[in-house]
């Protein structure tokens, strides 16, 4: 059986940590573990998921839950309640629901104080990792038979009915993910006619019916060129000389969004080297299977701008294609020939590799995320197959792997700090302090130990990095990358917990460390008043015209985000109340400008676009929370009135809310089909209305929402897993299984606290 290990580094000499691996979560397979009953429980969960995979596509993250509930001997001893038609909700029944949810949520916590969970959903995360270890000769050591079995299970579970795979688990089939997952199956041992439910044949038919892999998007062209299934001549240029451009140019790396910068950094190294892995018999077979004409006859120059229509979310503007054509026709032939290959290209590759090593070392070889991780790992191997850098990368691969009832996938990276911050706030909101003292103390300890206490090493500005001291990351301290909303939520948790006796929740965080967090937040506000997520926004918006991806939008430069802004307002308002003398004027100006940003970014229908959750419901919750914290009310703020109107008009007949993931790419509100409600959306909307003072005007919509949440609670005290609720870059969804535990509980806690009940 599979077991999740917490905060363990083992004795691997290539592993190192800044805080003794607090927050680390790694799965291990133990063939001797588990009773017959436990194994049967896991198999039943797997079977149920597969049989219902087209109805509910996100997993329930059950393997970890089975383990932790069993280890903690959890049994729900508090009886459930239901609210009948025409029945009035009482304080007592709400409290019973809260107690059941609180006990369950507290039991899901680990020994180091965080709440482990999957954070995945995109179907292009795992295949490149498989490609990388295949190319480098480490496939068998990184993915032994049980790993391969679970990776294949995940691929089969998320294959669409038409034979393809979507960009994410709920998406329509795309060439990018269908080709990647097909190759992944073949590398893991499936024959051309193999796979569950004829998976390989169905996938290959989909690929060939849509023009073959010459129509794969640019990221796919890169990976297939690395494998040798494609030719680098069929890719648009990614010159490493980009890394030696003078800083005054608008296209300098320092002006790029960090994720874009750190994806194209190792890509440009591999492109500059024109690296191709070993041409094995399997690679030769794949050339035959995936192209619609003989490999030797393909006109690679004509494939550069080909892309299947199913993959296109952001069509390249003409100016971009002209730039790529110019680089392809004029620049690359020069840079790859003497003397420029020695004078310029060699220097560019050295500088690029210097940046790769810097980013690796400052993230303890986790890197900023899974796409970058695999590319940087491969670049290190290309530079030195026996070097320590590659070995350190291999040691951190387990940090990215996650097992659920739908199989093994690769995480975007962990959401440990993100989930912990909201879980702690939800528990605090219940006011059931006496019943959850250990959970609060452990959560507090985890949050304190996870704060980043240093800036990136050395002259970090010359490496295009921003300050990180005082921040919280999305995952753990080792990751090292500051995020504004994670910092705001971490700061808020520490401030709220400081109001409780230390004998219950532990010693409060030192003021200097809180001041560091405030400094980080203040540094990330833009001239527009909004908050960027990772680094200050301010680069020219027209640079988005150069977005080289086909399936993401707004990835070239950093932007301001509603959620980050709303979180920061709430944290700084609370900080100002508890530390009124610290940078008072700066904080007041920050809040004033942040409120202006929220008012300016409200849409015509009264909602706010959510960048990291689905979608207008999510954004509206953060915006209304920020406005209310800043002292705005329904009476004195038109934005709040419009926001309330939006939420009330989108409430369903059953009292809930349900928003389709399609809202995010389409940028208009799209309800779930069939008038379905989603408990997470319902919780966000309920809290948004409570922030806006709805209970003082007409509490009926709040009662209807609370009724749905109370009646949706499951036997153990959690809530059902429904549609996916996370998103990034407008067009790709992320699955957060902990959301179904945290947000309904938090919303009902706020409901009980703010709405008069009999």
From Swiss-Prot:
PROSITE patterns recorded: TERPENE_SYNTHASES
Domain of life: Eukaryota
Keywords: Isomerase, Repeat
Gene Ontology terms for molecular function: beta-amyrin synthase activity
Positions annotated as active site in the UniProt record: 485 (proton donor)
Annotated NCBIfam families: squalene_cyclas
Entry protein name: Beta-amyrin synthase
């Amino acid at each position: 059986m599979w077991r999740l290990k917490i905060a363990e580094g083992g004795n691997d000499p290539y592993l190192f940590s800044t805080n003794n691996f607090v927050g680390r979560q790694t799965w291990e397979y133990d063939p001797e573990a588990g009773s017959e009953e436990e194994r049967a429980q896991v198999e039943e969960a797997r079977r149920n998921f597969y049989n219902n995979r087209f109805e509910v596509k996100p997993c329930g993250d059950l393997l970890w839950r089975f383990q932790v509930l069993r280890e903690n001997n959890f049994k729900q001893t508090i009886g459930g309640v239901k609210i009948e038609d025409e029945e009035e909700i009482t304080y007592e029944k709400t409290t019973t629901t809260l107690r059941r949810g609180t006990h369950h949520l507290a039991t899901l916590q680990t020994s180091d104080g965080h709440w482990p969970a999957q954070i995945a959903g995109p179907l292009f995360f795992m295949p490149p990792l498989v490609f990388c270890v295949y190319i480098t000769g480490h496939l068998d050591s990184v993915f032994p038979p049980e790993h391969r079995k679970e990776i294949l299970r995940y691929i089969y579970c998320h294959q669409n009915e038409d034979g393809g795979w979507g960009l994410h688990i709920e998406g329509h089939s795309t060439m990018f993910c269908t080709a990647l997952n097909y190759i992944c199956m073949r590398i893991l041992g499936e024959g051309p006619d193999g796979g569950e439910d004829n998976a390989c044949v169905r996938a290959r038919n989909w690929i060939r019916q849509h023009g073959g892999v010459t129509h794969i998007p640019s990221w796919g062209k890169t990976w297939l060129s690395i494998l040798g299934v494609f030719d680098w001549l069929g890719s648009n240029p990614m010159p490493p000389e980009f890394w030696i451009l003078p800083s005054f140019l608008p296209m300098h790396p320092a002006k790029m969004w960090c994720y874009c910068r750190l994806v194209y950094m190792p890509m440009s190294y591999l492109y500059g080297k024109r690296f191709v892995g070993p041409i094995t018999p399997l690679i030769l077979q794949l050339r035959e299977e995936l192209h619609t004409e003989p490999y030797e006859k393909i006109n690679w120059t004509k494939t550069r701008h080909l892309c299947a229509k199913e993959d296109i979310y952001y069509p390249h503007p003409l100016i971009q294609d002209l730039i790529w054509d110019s680089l392809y026709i004029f620049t690359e032939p020069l840079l790859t020939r003497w003397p420029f290959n020695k004078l310029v290209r060699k220097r560019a590759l050295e500088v690029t590799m210097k940046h790769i090593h810097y980013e690796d070392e400052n993230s303890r070889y986790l890197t900023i995320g899974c796409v970058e991780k695999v590319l940087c790992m491969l670049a290190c191997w290309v530079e030195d197959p026996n070097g320590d850098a590659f070995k350190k990368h291999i040691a951190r691969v387990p940090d990215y792997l996650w097992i659920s009832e739908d199989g093994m996938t690769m995480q975007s990276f962990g959401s440990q700090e993100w989930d912990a911050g909201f879980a702690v706030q939800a528990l605090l909101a219940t006011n059931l302090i006496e019943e959850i003292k250990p959970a609060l103390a452990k959560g507090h300890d985890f949050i304190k130990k996870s704060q980043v206490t240093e800036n990136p090493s050395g002259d970090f500005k010359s490496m295009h990095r921003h300050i990180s001291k005082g921040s919280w990351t999305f995952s753990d301290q080792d990751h090292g990358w500051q995020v504004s909303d994670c910092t705001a939520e971490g700061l808020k948790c520490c401030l709220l917990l400081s109001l409780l006796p230390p004998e219950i929740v532990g010693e409060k965080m030192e003021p200097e460390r809180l001041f560091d967090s405030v400094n980080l937040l203040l540094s990330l506000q833009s001239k527009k008043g909004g908050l960027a997520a990772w680094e200050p926004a301010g680069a020219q918006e027209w640079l988005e015209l150069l977005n080289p991806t086909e399936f993401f939008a707004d990835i070239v430069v950093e932007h301001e985000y509603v959620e980050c802004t709303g979180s920061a307002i709430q944290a700084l308002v609370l900080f100002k109340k508890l530390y009124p003398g610290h940078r008072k004027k700066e904080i007041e100006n920050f809040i004033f400008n942040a409120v202006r940003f929220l008012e300016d970014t409200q849409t015509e229908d009264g909602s706010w676009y959510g960048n990291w959750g689905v979608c207008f419901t999510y954004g509206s919750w953060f915006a209304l929370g920020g406005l209310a914290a800043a002292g705005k009310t329904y009476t004195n703020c038109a934005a709040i009135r419009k926001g309330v109107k939006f939420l009330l008009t989108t409430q369903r007949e059953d009292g809930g809310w349900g928003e389709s993931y399609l809202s995010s790419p389409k940028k208009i509100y799209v309800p779930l089909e069939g008038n379905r409600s989603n408990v997470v959306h319902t919780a966000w909307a309920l809290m948004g209305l409570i922030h806006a003072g709805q209970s003082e005007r007409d509490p009926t919509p709040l009662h209807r929402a609370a009724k749905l949440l109370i009646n949706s609670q499951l036997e153990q005290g959690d809530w059902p897993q429904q549609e996916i609720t996370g998103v990034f870059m407008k067009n790709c969804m992320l699955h957060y299984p902990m959301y179904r535990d945290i947000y309904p509980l938090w919303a009902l806690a706020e409901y009980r606290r703010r709405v008069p009940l009999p």
